[in-house]
Amino acid sequence: MASPATSSAVLVVVLVATLAAGGANAATFTITNRCSFTVWPAATPVGGGVQLSPGQTWTINVPAGTSSGRVWGRTGCSFDGSGRGSCATGDCAGALSCTLSGQKPLTLAEFTIGGSQDFYDLSVIDGYNVAMSFSCSSGVTVTCRDSRCPDAYLFPEDNTKTHACSGNSNYQVVFCP
């Protein structure tokens, strides 16, 4: 039989592990710019947006409880020190850190996470602005290099473009793969 001290220590370890799991991330998104030009990726509802020079990577830790979101690249952007400005494509109300979806045209990575299975896709329904690939750690890579992209949603009822992967997967978005 365990001593009271041992039982208390085990209980503390279990409580700490439970609390740590409650604050865990639902997924990690690694976004890389392989283009020869700067891309300003945006992510909603988490992440916001940043400037990525060629070769740079941005990592987003999506918190548990997030059920879906979008990632896209913006091009031709100019922002001031307060994060206000504009982009030629994918602009989100003139903000560097997006809280709204981007404006057409934009190549869009979409995800639904949580539970035992996640879903993800690329879409060019709202236009095409930059080549992109999107993959999860346990699924296939979907790639879009032009506006006639066979791996992406081309119209809303195009229900053959969604891909599944096991829950708790991590994701990679690459611009100009």
Curated annotation (Swiss-Prot):
Pfam families: Thaumatin (PF00314). The keyword Secreted applies. Induction: By pathogen infection. InterPro entries: Osmotin/thaumatin-like_sf, Thaumatin, Thaumatin_CS. It is found in: Secreted. Belongs to the thaumatin family. This is Thaumatin-like protein. It comes from Oryza sativa subsp. japonica (Rice).
